[in-house]
Amino acid sequence: MGKGASVASVKVGKTGFETRKNIPGNIKEIKPSLLMSVPALAKNFRKNIEKNISAKGPVIEKLFNHALKLSYSYNKEGINKGKGLQILKKPLLFLYDKILFSKIREGFGGKIDFFIGGGALLDIELQRFFYAIGMPMFQGYGLTEAAPIISGNALERHKLGSSGFLVQNLELKICDENGNKLPVGKKGEIIVKGDNVMVGYWKNEEATKSTLKNGWLYTGDMGYMDHDGFLYVLGRFKSLLISDDGEKYSPEGIEEAFTDQSPYIDQCMLYNNQNPYTVVLIVPDKEAINRKLKEENQ
């Protein structure tokens, strides 16, 4: 923990906690170079950005969407940014950044180098959006039991959609339900070993034995390693849904896709217990629906 830091905000003997509505103003005032965020807050940032762009009229909105599309194709997954003929798009992207994206960044203080996303799986579409406007949002992975960083992306080496590359002096393997090591690209439980892994749970020998085996920490998370050395975390290994043909899949990514693709869905939850079909419980975004109905009735 030689490079770690702990920061607390204390005022008049009390710990301060900000409300969400004040966060945008605080960011603009402080002008941070690094911002740590959870996906829910980042999604709220994106909604506000798109809302402000839409309010400027159809011409600006169309120009912004074209700039996003161009930036997406240029950036790709980050690791292959601007490769080959994509480099020809750079002059136009520079112009778009000057007249559009830089103005958005000013709303965040104008100095942010990148976001760090944590607390939950970060949707790749959200990463592409912030990457396009010049404020990359990188995902990492860690556990308290691993003190806590296991992997992370960095400005000089990153791949959108991944949880990054492993920290130094850490071993990782992907295993099946029986503890057998799987090859690169195969999905299984993420298991790690290294000096940063805990000795055990305080006064809980039973939990320690089930989590630590021969020095290996069984995280309970499902994922895989790709051929470029990046880790992909897919969800909790024990929360997998099972269809009637025995296929197992993680619900988190599908649930994220539902809420990301429709502005009228607030939350959703998938369920399947060895049935031939999967059901989903959807909670509508009443405010968004009412707003759309008012627009249609005008």
What kind of feature is each model-predicted range?
Residues 5-29, 58-59, 249-254:
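ATP-dependent adenylate-forming carboxylate-activation enzymes
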Residues 5, 33-36, 47-158, 263:
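Gly/Ser/Thr-rich phosphate-binding loop
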Residues 166, 173-175, 180-185, 191-243:
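Conserved ATP-binding/catalytic segment of the ANL
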Residues 194, 199-200, 222-298:
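AMP-binding/adenylate-forming catalytic core of the ANL superfamily
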Residues 13-52:
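P-loop NTPase motor core
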Residues 40, 120-121, 196, 287:
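Alpha-helix/helix-capping structural signal
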Residues 112, 167-170, 265:
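Core-facing hydrophobic residues within beta-strands of well-ordered domains
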Residues 8-10, 115-117, 242-243:
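Short catalytic-loop micro-motif centered on adjacent basic/acidic residues
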